[in-house]
Protein backbone atom coordinates (compact mmCIF):
# COMPACT_ATOMS: atom_id res chain seq x y z
CA UNK A 1 0.00 0.00 0.00
CA UNK A 2 1.14 3.56 -0.70
CA UNK A 3 -0.20 7.04 0.01
CA UNK A 4 0.90 9.80 -2.34
CA UNK A 5 -0.51 12.79 -4.22
CA UNK A 6 -1.86 13.01 -7.78
CA UNK A 7 -2.52 16.52 -9.06
CA UNK A 8 -2.66 17.78 -5.49
CA UNK A 9 -5.11 15.15 -4.23
CA UNK A 10 -4.04 12.51 -1.73
CA UNK A 11 -4.60 8.96 -2.97
CA UNK A 12 -4.26 5.59 -1.26
CA UNK A 13 -3.30 2.69 -3.51
CA UNK A 14 -3.78 -0.76 -2.00
CA UNK A 15 -2.49 -2.86 -4.90
CA UNK A 16 1.12 -2.39 -5.95
CA UNK A 17 1.09 -1.69 -9.69
CA UNK A 18 2.78 0.36 -12.36
CA UNK A 19 1.95 4.05 -11.96
CA UNK A 20 0.78 4.16 -15.59
CA UNK A 21 -1.87 1.53 -14.97
CA UNK A 22 -3.13 3.26 -11.83
CA UNK A 23 -3.36 6.68 -13.49
CA UNK A 24 -5.17 5.36 -16.55
CA UNK A 25 -7.22 2.40 -15.34
CA UNK A 26 -8.27 3.70 -11.91
CA UNK A 27 -8.14 7.49 -12.12
CA UNK A 28 -8.82 7.62 -15.90
CA UNK A 29 -6.19 10.32 -16.40
CA UNK A 30 -5.87 9.52 -20.07
CA UNK A 31 -3.45 12.29 -20.98
CA UNK A 32 -0.87 9.75 -19.80
CA UNK A 33 -0.53 7.71 -22.99
CA UNK A 34 0.53 4.07 -23.18
CA UNK A 35 2.89 3.82 -26.13
CA UNK A 36 5.17 0.95 -25.15
CA UNK A 37 4.76 -0.04 -21.46
CA UNK A 38 8.51 -0.56 -21.24
CA UNK A 39 10.04 2.85 -20.55
CA UNK A 40 11.11 3.55 -24.12
CA UNK A 41 8.86 6.11 -25.81
CA UNK A 42 8.07 8.76 -23.19
CA UNK A 43 4.38 9.09 -24.12
CA UNK A 44 3.44 8.35 -20.50
CA UNK A 45 5.70 11.04 -19.00
CA UNK A 46 4.47 12.61 -15.76
CA UNK A 47 6.16 14.86 -13.21
CA UNK A 48 7.15 13.27 -9.91
CA UNK A 49 8.29 15.95 -7.48
CA UNK A 50 8.93 18.13 -10.53
CA UNK A 51 11.06 15.61 -12.44
CA UNK A 52 9.89 14.06 -15.75
CA UNK A 53 9.45 10.32 -15.20
CA UNK A 54 7.97 7.71 -17.53
CA UNK A 55 4.93 6.43 -15.65
CA UNK A 56 5.23 2.88 -16.97
CA UNK A 57 8.42 2.28 -14.96
CA UNK A 58 7.80 3.09 -11.23
CA UNK A 59 5.54 0.97 -9.04
CA UNK A 60 3.04 2.74 -6.80
CA UNK A 61 4.59 1.33 -3.60
CA UNK A 62 7.72 3.37 -4.37
CA UNK A 63 5.83 6.67 -4.41
CA UNK A 64 4.89 7.16 -0.75
CA UNK A 65 4.59 10.85 0.05
CA UNK A 66 5.55 11.99 -3.43
CA UNK A 67 3.67 14.38 -5.73
CA UNK A 68 2.63 13.27 -9.22
CA UNK A 69 1.48 15.81 -11.80
CA UNK A 70 -0.21 14.99 -15.11
CA UNK A 71 -1.36 17.45 -17.77
CA UNK A 72 -4.80 17.40 -16.14
CA UNK A 73 -3.16 18.90 -13.05
CA UNK A 74 -1.65 21.96 -14.74
CA UNK A 75 -3.00 25.36 -13.74
CA UNK A 76 -5.43 27.06 -16.11
CA UNK A 77 -2.72 29.55 -17.03
CA UNK A 78 -0.27 26.75 -17.86
CA UNK A 79 -2.89 25.03 -19.98
CA UNK A 80 -3.45 28.24 -21.97
CA UNK A 81 0.30 28.76 -22.32
CA UNK A 82 1.14 25.33 -23.70
CA UNK A 83 -1.94 25.17 -25.90
CA UNK A 84 -0.95 28.50 -27.45
CA UNK A 85 2.77 27.72 -27.78
CA UNK A 86 2.33 24.28 -29.31
CA UNK A 87 -0.49 25.50 -31.55
CA UNK A 88 1.32 28.62 -32.75
CA UNK A 89 4.50 26.66 -33.50
CA UNK A 90 2.62 24.00 -35.46
CA UNK A 91 4.10 21.37 -33.16
CA UNK A 92 1.03 19.14 -32.98
CA UNK A 93 0.29 16.43 -35.54
CA UNK A 94 -1.06 13.07 -34.33
CA UNK A 95 -0.81 14.41 -30.78
CA UNK A 96 -0.01 11.15 -29.03
CA UNK A 97 3.37 12.32 -27.72
CA UNK A 98 2.36 15.89 -26.92
CA UNK A 99 1.17 15.66 -23.26
CA UNK A 100 4.51 14.07 -22.38
CA UNK A 101 6.35 16.77 -24.30
CA UNK A 102 4.37 19.46 -22.48
CA UNK A 103 5.37 18.12 -19.07
CA UNK A 104 9.03 17.96 -20.12
CA UNK A 105 8.67 21.58 -21.28
CA UNK A 106 7.18 22.61 -17.94
CA UNK A 107 9.93 20.84 -15.99
CA UNK A 108 12.58 22.66 -18.03
CA UNK A 109 10.99 26.10 -17.85
CA UNK A 110 10.28 25.83 -14.12
CA UNK A 111 14.07 25.84 -13.72
CA UNK A 112 15.28 27.86 -16.69
CA UNK A 113 13.36 30.46 -18.70
CA UNK A 114 16.26 31.01 -21.11
CA UNK A 115 17.16 27.50 -22.25
CA UNK A 116 19.70 26.95 -25.01
CA UNK A 117 18.91 24.62 -27.89
CA UNK A 118 21.13 21.97 -26.34
CA UNK A 119 19.25 22.28 -23.06
CA UNK A 120 15.93 21.91 -24.86
CA UNK A 121 17.18 18.83 -26.69
CA UNK A 122 18.37 17.35 -23.41
CA UNK A 123 15.02 18.03 -21.75
CA UNK A 124 13.19 16.19 -24.55
CA UNK A 125 15.72 13.38 -24.93
CA UNK A 126 13.51 10.63 -23.49
CA UNK A 127 10.41 11.50 -25.53
CA UNK A 128 9.86 10.16 -29.02
CA UNK A 129 7.91 12.01 -31.69
CA UNK A 130 7.38 10.10 -34.93
CA UNK A 131 5.53 12.90 -36.77
CA UNK A 132 7.37 16.20 -36.50
CA UNK A 133 11.10 15.66 -36.51
CA UNK A 134 11.22 17.76 -33.28
CA UNK A 135 11.91 21.08 -35.03
CA UNK A 136 8.44 22.46 -34.36
CA UNK A 137 8.42 21.05 -30.84
CA UNK A 138 11.63 22.92 -30.07
CA UNK A 139 10.01 26.04 -31.54
CA UNK A 140 7.09 25.51 -29.13
CA UNK A 141 9.44 25.26 -26.14
CA UNK A 142 11.21 28.48 -27.16
CA UNK A 143 7.87 30.26 -27.61
CA UNK A 144 6.57 29.02 -24.25
CA UNK A 145 9.76 30.29 -22.60
CA UNK A 146 9.35 33.69 -24.27
CA UNK A 147 5.73 33.94 -23.11
CA UNK A 148 6.71 33.09 -19.54
CA UNK A 149 9.57 35.59 -19.54
CA UNK A 150 7.31 38.36 -20.81
CA UNK A 151 4.31 37.32 -18.73
CA UNK A 152 2.02 37.46 -21.76
CA UNK A 153 0.05 34.63 -23.39
CA UNK A 154 -1.44 35.83 -26.69
CA UNK A 155 -4.92 34.68 -27.63
CA UNK A 156 -5.40 32.69 -30.82
CA UNK A 157 -8.57 34.19 -32.29
CA UNK A 158 -10.83 32.64 -34.90
CA UNK A 159 -11.23 36.17 -36.26
CA UNK A 160 -7.70 35.78 -37.67
CA UNK A 161 -8.71 32.75 -39.76
CA UNK A 162 -8.49 34.03 -43.30
CA UNK A 163 -6.84 33.08 -46.56
CA UNK A 164 -3.08 33.44 -46.32
CA UNK A 165 -2.94 33.51 -42.53
CA UNK A 166 -1.40 30.88 -40.26
CA UNK A 167 -4.00 29.30 -38.00
CA UNK A 168 -3.90 26.74 -35.22
CA UNK A 169 -5.13 23.22 -35.83
CA UNK A 170 -8.72 22.83 -34.68
CA UNK A 171 -7.70 19.90 -32.46
CA UNK A 172 -4.70 21.58 -30.80
CA UNK A 173 -6.27 22.00 -27.37
CA UNK A 174 -7.60 18.46 -27.00
CA UNK A 175 -4.25 17.02 -28.06
CA UNK A 176 -2.06 19.33 -25.98
CA UNK A 177 -4.19 18.86 -22.87
CA UNK A 178 -4.71 15.16 -23.51
CA UNK A 179 -8.48 14.99 -23.37
CA UNK A 180 -8.93 14.05 -27.02
CA UNK A 181 -9.95 10.40 -27.34
CA UNK A 182 -7.84 7.68 -28.89
CA UNK A 183 -9.56 4.26 -28.69
CA UNK A 184 -7.52 3.17 -25.67
CA UNK A 185 -8.78 6.24 -23.78
CA UNK A 186 -12.32 4.86 -23.64
CA UNK A 187 -13.35 3.21 -20.36
CA UNK A 188 -16.96 2.12 -20.72
CA UNK A 189 -19.29 0.39 -18.22
CA UNK A 190 -19.15 -3.42 -18.13
CA UNK A 191 -16.18 -3.44 -20.51
CA UNK A 192 -14.24 -6.66 -20.92
CA UNK A 193 -10.88 -7.17 -22.63
CA UNK A 194 -10.01 -9.20 -25.69
CA UNK A 195 -6.87 -10.52 -27.34
CA UNK A 196 -5.80 -13.16 -29.83
CA UNK A 197 -3.83 -16.34 -29.33
CA UNK A 198 -1.34 -16.19 -32.19
CA UNK A 199 0.57 -18.77 -34.17
CA UNK A 200 3.81 -20.17 -32.78
CA UNK A 201 5.04 -20.96 -36.29
CA UNK A 202 5.22 -18.89 -39.49
CA UNK A 203 3.97 -21.86 -41.51
CA UNK A 204 2.20 -24.80 -39.91
CA UNK A 205 -0.98 -26.84 -40.16
CA UNK A 206 -3.37 -26.31 -37.24
CA UNK A 207 -4.38 -29.81 -36.16
CA UNK A 208 -6.40 -29.07 -33.03
CA UNK A 209 -7.46 -26.21 -30.75
CA UNK A 210 -8.31 -27.07 -27.12
CA UNK A 211 -10.06 -24.18 -25.39
CA UNK A 212 -11.54 -26.12 -22.46
CA UNK A 213 -9.09 -25.01 -19.76
CA UNK A 214 -9.31 -21.39 -20.81
CA UNK A 215 -13.11 -21.49 -20.85
CA UNK A 216 -13.13 -22.99 -17.34
CA UNK A 217 -11.07 -20.15 -15.88
CA UNK A 218 -13.25 -17.83 -13.73
CA UNK A 219 -13.61 -14.43 -15.37
CA UNK A 220 -13.34 -15.67 -18.94
CA UNK A 221 -16.24 -14.33 -21.01
CA UNK A 222 -15.73 -16.45 -24.12
CA UNK A 223 -13.15 -18.17 -26.29
CA UNK A 224 -13.82 -17.84 -30.02
CA UNK A 225 -12.43 -19.90 -32.90
CA UNK A 226 -12.93 -19.81 -36.66
CA UNK A 227 -15.90 -22.18 -36.33
CA UNK A 228 -17.79 -19.41 -34.50
CA UNK A 229 -17.46 -16.82 -37.28
CA UNK A 230 -20.97 -16.10 -38.64
CA UNK A 231 -19.83 -14.58 -41.94
CA UNK A 232 -16.70 -14.70 -44.09
CA UNK A 233 -13.43 -15.58 -42.39
CA UNK A 234 -11.16 -13.75 -44.84
CA UNK A 235 -10.73 -9.99 -44.82
CA UNK A 236 -8.30 -7.75 -46.68
CA UNK A 237 -7.77 -4.21 -47.90
CA UNK A 238 -7.97 -4.95 -51.62
CA UNK A 239 -7.86 -8.75 -51.74
CA UNK A 240 -9.61 -10.89 -49.15
CA UNK A 241 -6.71 -13.19 -48.25
CA UNK A 242 -6.18 -12.34 -44.57
CA UNK A 243 -7.73 -14.92 -42.27
CA UNK A 244 -9.45 -13.43 -39.23
CA UNK A 245 -8.90 -16.74 -37.40
CA UNK A 246 -7.04 -19.78 -38.72
CA UNK A 247 -9.42 -22.79 -38.69
CA UNK A 248 -8.57 -26.34 -37.67
CA UNK A 249 -6.96 -27.91 -40.72
CA UNK A 250 -5.89 -24.49 -41.97
CA UNK A 251 -2.42 -23.22 -42.69
CA UNK A 252 -0.74 -20.42 -40.75
CA UNK A 253 0.96 -17.77 -42.85
CA UNK A 254 3.10 -15.87 -40.33
CA UNK A 255 3.65 -15.52 -36.61
CA UNK A 256 0.93 -12.88 -36.38
CA UNK A 257 -1.91 -15.15 -37.50
CA UNK A 258 -4.72 -15.33 -34.93
CA UNK A 259 -5.82 -18.85 -33.93
CA UNK A 260 -8.38 -18.00 -31.24
CA UNK A 261 -9.86 -14.96 -29.53
CA UNK A 262 -10.20 -14.73 -25.77
CA UNK A 263 -12.42 -12.25 -23.93
CA UNK A 264 -12.10 -11.84 -20.16
CA UNK A 265 -13.21 -9.50 -17.40
CA UNK A 266 -9.73 -8.12 -16.66
CA UNK A 267 -6.43 -7.86 -18.55
CA UNK A 268 -4.82 -10.12 -15.94
CA UNK A 269 -7.37 -12.91 -16.43
CA UNK A 270 -7.07 -12.44 -20.18
CA UNK A 271 -3.33 -13.15 -20.16
CA UNK A 272 -3.79 -16.25 -17.99
CA UNK A 273 -6.55 -17.56 -20.25
CA UNK A 274 -4.54 -17.09 -23.45
CA UNK A 275 -1.82 -19.35 -22.03
CA UNK A 276 -4.42 -22.06 -21.36
CA UNK A 277 -5.50 -22.32 -25.02
CA UNK A 278 -3.62 -25.32 -26.39
CA UNK A 279 -2.99 -25.47 -30.13
CA UNK A 280 -1.55 -28.55 -31.84
CA UNK A 281 0.51 -27.79 -34.94
CA UNK A 282 2.24 -29.64 -37.72
CA UNK A 283 5.23 -27.35 -38.41
CA UNK A 284 6.01 -26.99 -42.11
CA UNK A 285 8.86 -25.45 -44.13
CA UNK A 286 8.44 -21.68 -44.43
CA UNK A 287 9.13 -19.23 -47.25
CA UNK A 288 11.46 -16.50 -46.00
CA UNK A 289 12.13 -14.28 -49.04
CA UNK A 290 11.33 -13.87 -52.77
CA UNK A 291 14.20 -16.11 -53.97
CA UNK A 292 12.75 -18.91 -51.84
CA UNK A 293 9.23 -18.02 -53.04
CA UNK A 294 10.09 -18.36 -56.74
CA UNK A 295 12.26 -21.45 -56.33
CA UNK A 296 11.16 -24.63 -58.07
CA UNK A 297 8.94 -26.74 -55.81
CA UNK A 298 8.77 -23.91 -53.25
CA UNK A 299 6.19 -24.38 -50.47
CA UNK A 300 3.02 -22.42 -51.20
CA UNK A 301 2.19 -19.77 -48.65
CA UNK A 302 -1.51 -20.24 -49.44
CA UNK A 303 -2.97 -23.68 -50.14
CA UNK A 304 -5.58 -22.15 -52.40
CA UNK A 305 -3.13 -20.23 -54.61
CA UNK A 306 -1.39 -21.80 -57.62
CA UNK A 307 1.92 -20.09 -56.82
CA UNK A 308 3.49 -17.56 -54.47
CA UNK A 309 3.07 -14.72 -56.97
CA UNK A 310 0.84 -12.03 -55.50
CA UNK A 311 1.10 -9.45 -58.31
CA UNK A 312 2.94 -8.88 -61.60
CA UNK A 313 3.56 -5.62 -63.47
CA UNK A 314 5.25 -4.91 -66.81
CA UNK A 315 5.95 -1.36 -67.96
CA UNK A 316 7.83 -0.56 -71.18
CA UNK A 317 8.48 2.22 -73.67
CA UNK A 318 10.65 2.23 -76.77
CA UNK A 319 13.27 -0.49 -77.29
CA UNK A 320 15.41 -0.81 -74.17
CA UNK A 321 17.39 -3.82 -75.43
CA UNK A 322 18.58 -2.04 -78.58
CA UNK A 323 19.28 1.21 -76.72
CA UNK A 324 21.46 -0.58 -74.18
CA UNK A 325 23.19 -2.66 -76.87
CA UNK A 326 24.16 0.51 -78.76
CA UNK A 327 25.30 2.41 -75.64
CA UNK A 328 28.93 3.42 -75.14
CA UNK A 329 28.84 2.36 -71.50
CA UNK A 330 26.67 -0.26 -69.78
CA UNK A 331 26.46 -0.98 -66.07
CA UNK A 332 24.48 -3.65 -64.23
CA UNK A 333 23.90 -3.61 -60.48
CA UNK A 334 21.92 -5.57 -57.89
CA UNK A 335 20.19 -3.67 -55.07
CA UNK A 336 18.24 -4.71 -51.99
CA UNK A 337 16.17 -2.63 -49.58
CA UNK A 338 14.99 -3.85 -46.14
CA UNK A 339 11.55 -3.80 -44.63
CA UNK A 340 10.92 -0.66 -42.58
CA UNK A 341 8.73 -0.22 -39.52
CA UNK A 342 6.28 2.71 -39.37
CA UNK A 343 7.02 3.21 -35.66
CA UNK A 344 3.83 5.12 -34.87
CA UNK A 345 3.57 5.73 -31.13
CA UNK A 346 0.00 4.54 -30.57
CA UNK A 347 -0.41 0.75 -30.62
CA UNK A 348 -3.50 -0.45 -32.46
CA UNK A 349 -6.65 -0.54 -30.34
CA UNK A 350 -10.40 -0.84 -30.88
CA UNK A 351 -13.37 -0.63 -28.54
CA UNK A 352 -16.64 -2.22 -29.60
CA UNK A 353 -20.13 -2.19 -28.09
CA UNK A 354 -23.81 -2.50 -28.99
CA UNK A 355 -25.16 1.00 -29.61
CA UNK A 356 -28.72 2.15 -28.79
CA UNK A 357 -29.88 1.20 -32.30
CA UNK A 358 -28.67 -2.38 -31.89
CA UNK A 359 -25.63 -1.92 -34.13
CA UNK A 360 -22.13 -3.13 -33.36
CA UNK A 361 -20.25 0.15 -32.93
CA UNK A 362 -16.47 -0.01 -33.39
CA UNK A 363 -14.32 2.86 -32.10
CA UNK A 364 -11.20 2.59 -34.21
CA UNK A 365 -7.76 4.08 -34.79
CA UNK A 366 -7.92 3.80 -38.52
CA UNK A 367 -6.65 5.14 -41.84
CA UNK A 368 -9.35 3.30 -43.78
CA UNK A 369 -12.55 3.38 -41.76
CA UNK A 370 -14.89 2.73 -44.70
CA UNK A 371 -12.92 -0.38 -45.66
CA UNK A 372 -12.93 -1.46 -42.02
CA UNK A 373 -16.71 -1.11 -41.97
CA UNK A 374 -17.09 -3.20 -45.13
CA UNK A 375 -14.80 -5.95 -43.86
CA UNK A 376 -16.50 -6.11 -40.44
CA UNK A 377 -19.86 -6.50 -42.17
CA UNK A 378 -18.50 -9.41 -44.20
CA UNK A 379 -17.01 -11.06 -41.11
CA UNK A 380 -20.20 -10.78 -39.07
CA UNK A 381 -22.54 -11.52 -41.95
CA UNK A 382 -24.54 -8.46 -40.87
CA UNK A 383 -25.06 -4.90 -42.05
CA UNK A 384 -25.68 -3.74 -38.49
CA UNK A 385 -22.15 -2.43 -37.98
CA UNK A 386 -20.85 1.11 -37.55
CA UNK A 387 -17.26 2.31 -37.39
CA UNK A 388 -16.41 5.62 -35.75
CA UNK A 389 -12.84 6.83 -36.17
CA UNK A 390 -11.15 8.26 -33.11
CA UNK A 391 -7.91 10.22 -32.98
CA UNK A 392 -5.12 8.29 -34.69
CA UNK A 393 -1.77 8.28 -32.90
CA UNK A 394 0.30 8.08 -36.05
CA UNK A 395 -0.22 5.84 -39.04
CA UNK A 396 1.92 6.65 -42.08
CA UNK A 397 0.17 3.86 -44.00
CA UNK A 398 0.56 1.25 -41.26
CA UNK A 399 -3.04 1.59 -40.06
CA UNK A 400 -4.76 1.15 -43.42
CA UNK A 401 -5.18 -2.61 -42.94
CA UNK A 402 -7.35 -4.43 -40.43
CA UNK A 403 -5.59 -5.13 -37.14
CA UNK A 404 -7.93 -5.50 -34.14
CA UNK A 405 -11.15 -3.83 -35.28
CA UNK A 406 -12.69 -7.03 -36.67
CA UNK A 407 -11.76 -9.01 -33.57
CA UNK A 408 -13.42 -6.44 -31.30
CA UNK A 409 -16.53 -6.44 -33.49
CA UNK A 410 -16.69 -10.25 -33.47
CA UNK A 411 -16.43 -10.48 -29.68
CA UNK A 412 -19.21 -7.91 -29.23
CA UNK A 413 -21.41 -9.56 -31.87
CA UNK A 414 -21.12 -13.00 -30.25
CA UNK A 415 -21.27 -11.95 -26.58
CA UNK A 416 -23.19 -8.67 -26.56
CA UNK A 417 -20.41 -7.24 -24.38
CA UNK A 418 -18.44 -4.03 -24.65
CA UNK A 419 -14.83 -5.00 -25.31
CA UNK A 420 -11.42 -3.36 -25.71
CA UNK A 421 -8.90 -5.14 -27.93
CA UNK A 422 -5.43 -3.62 -27.86
CA UNK A 423 -2.09 -4.79 -29.21
CA UNK A 424 1.02 -4.77 -27.08
CA UNK A 425 3.98 -3.03 -28.68
CA UNK A 426 5.62 -6.38 -29.65
CA UNK A 427 2.32 -7.53 -31.18
CA UNK A 428 2.01 -4.27 -33.09
CA UNK A 429 5.52 -4.62 -34.49
CA UNK A 430 4.74 -8.16 -35.59
CA UNK A 431 1.30 -7.69 -37.07
CA UNK A 432 0.87 -4.49 -39.03
CA UNK A 433 2.25 -4.17 -42.59
CA UNK A 434 5.73 -2.74 -43.16
CA UNK A 435 7.46 -1.06 -46.08
CA UNK A 436 8.11 -3.73 -48.72
CA UNK A 437 11.61 -5.18 -48.95
CA UNK A 438 12.76 -5.19 -52.58
CA UNK A 439 15.30 -7.18 -54.61
CA UNK A 440 16.27 -5.29 -57.79
CA UNK A 441 18.50 -5.90 -60.81
CA UNK A 442 19.13 -2.81 -62.97
CA UNK A 443 20.96 -2.49 -66.27
CA UNK A 444 21.60 1.01 -67.65
CA UNK A 445 23.25 2.22 -70.83
CA UNK A 446 24.58 5.72 -71.53
CA UNK A 447 26.46 7.51 -74.31
CA UNK A 448 29.97 8.97 -74.14
CA UNK A 449 28.56 12.09 -72.42
CA UNK A 450 26.84 10.10 -69.69
CA UNK A 451 23.36 10.68 -71.13
CA UNK A 452 21.10 7.72 -70.32
CA UNK A 453 19.97 5.81 -73.40
CA UNK A 454 17.99 2.98 -71.85
CA UNK A 455 17.20 1.09 -68.66
CA UNK A 456 16.04 -2.44 -67.94
CA UNK A 457 15.08 -3.63 -64.50
CA UNK A 458 13.59 -6.62 -62.78
CA UNK A 459 12.24 -5.91 -59.32
CA UNK A 460 10.86 -8.33 -56.77
CA UNK A 461 9.03 -7.42 -53.59
CA UNK A 462 8.25 -9.37 -50.44
CA UNK A 463 4.59 -8.68 -49.71
CA UNK A 464 4.58 -11.04 -46.74
CA UNK A 465 1.70 -13.11 -45.45
CA UNK A 466 -1.16 -11.36 -47.24
CA UNK A 467 -1.59 -8.97 -50.14
CA UNK A 468 -2.42 -5.73 -48.35
CA UNK A 469 -1.47 -3.06 -50.91
CA UNK A 470 1.23 -5.17 -52.54
CA UNK A 471 -0.20 -4.65 -56.03
CA UNK A 472 -0.39 -0.82 -55.97
CA UNK A 473 3.00 -0.57 -54.26
CA UNK A 474 4.55 -2.75 -56.97
CA UNK A 475 2.86 -0.68 -59.68
CA UNK A 476 4.26 2.55 -58.24
CA UNK A 477 7.69 0.98 -57.84
CA UNK A 478 7.74 -0.10 -61.48
CA UNK A 479 6.33 3.20 -62.75
CA UNK A 480 9.05 5.20 -60.99
CA UNK A 481 11.93 2.76 -61.50
CA UNK A 482 13.00 4.60 -64.66
CA UNK A 483 13.67 7.69 -62.56
CA UNK A 484 12.96 11.36 -63.35
CA UNK A 485 15.22 11.54 -66.40
CA UNK A 486 14.16 12.25 -69.99
CA UNK A 487 14.88 9.18 -72.11
CA UNK A 488 12.64 7.05 -74.25
CA UNK A 489 13.72 3.44 -73.78
CA UNK A 490 12.98 1.42 -70.67
CA UNK A 491 11.48 -1.91 -69.64
CA UNK A 492 10.56 -2.73 -66.06
CA UNK A 493 9.23 -6.07 -64.83
CA UNK A 494 7.99 -6.40 -61.29
CA UNK A 495 6.72 -9.32 -59.24
CA UNK A 496 5.38 -9.31 -55.68
CA UNK A 497 5.68 -12.58 -53.79
CA UNK A 498 3.86 -13.99 -50.82
CA UNK A 499 6.20 -15.14 -48.04
CA UNK A 500 5.73 -16.25 -44.44
CA UNK A 501 7.03 -12.91 -43.18
CA UNK A 502 4.94 -10.14 -41.59
CA UNK A 503 2.86 -8.43 -44.27
CA UNK A 504 4.06 -5.41 -46.21
CA UNK A 505 1.73 -2.67 -47.41
CA UNK A 506 1.25 1.07 -47.49
CA UNK A 507 4.11 3.28 -46.28
CA UNK A 508 4.93 6.88 -47.12
CA UNK A 509 6.56 6.88 -50.55
CA UNK A 510 4.65 3.77 -51.64
CA UNK A 511 7.20 1.84 -53.74
CA UNK A 512 8.95 4.92 -55.10
CA UNK A 513 11.52 4.95 -52.30
CA UNK A 514 12.57 1.39 -53.09
CA UNK A 515 13.21 1.71 -56.83
Residue ranges with predicted function:
Residues 62, 74, 229, 366-369, ...:
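Acidic, glycine-rich active-site loops and adjacent beta-strand->loop/helix elements
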Residues 141, 240-270, 398-445, 504-515:
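Glycine-rich and small/hydrophobic secondary-structure elements
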Residues 145-310, 330, 414:
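Flexible, low-hydrophobicity surface segments
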Residues 90, 165, 171-177, 238, ...:
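Glycine-rich loop/linker segments at domain edges
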Residues 101, 110, 196-226, 260-280, ...:
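Alpha-helical support elements that line or immediately flank enzyme active sites
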Residues 35-38, 118-125, 226, 384-391, ...:
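Beta-strand segments within the central parallel beta-sheet cores of soluble alpha/beta enzyme folds
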Residues 83, 105-109, 142-143, 233-238, ...:
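Short acidic, glycine/serine/threonine-rich loops at helix termini
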Residues 1-156, 174:
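Signature of N-terminal electron-transfer/Fe-S-associated modules in redox systems
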Amino acid sequence: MAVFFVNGTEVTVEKNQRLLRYLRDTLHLTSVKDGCSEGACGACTVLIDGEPIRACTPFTDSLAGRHVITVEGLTDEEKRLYTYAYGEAGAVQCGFCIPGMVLCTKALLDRNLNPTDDQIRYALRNNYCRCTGYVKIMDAVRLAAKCRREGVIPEASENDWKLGSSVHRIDVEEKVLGYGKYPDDWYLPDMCYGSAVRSQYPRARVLAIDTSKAEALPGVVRVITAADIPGENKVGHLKHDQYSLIPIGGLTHYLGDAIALVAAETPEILEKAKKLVKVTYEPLPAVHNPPEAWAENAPRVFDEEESNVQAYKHIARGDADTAIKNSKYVISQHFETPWTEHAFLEPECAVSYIDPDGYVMVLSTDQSSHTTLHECKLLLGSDKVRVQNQLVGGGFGGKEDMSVQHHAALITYLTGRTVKVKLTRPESLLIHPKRHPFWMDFTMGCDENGIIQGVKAKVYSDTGAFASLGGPVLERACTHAAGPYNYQNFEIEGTAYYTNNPPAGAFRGFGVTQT
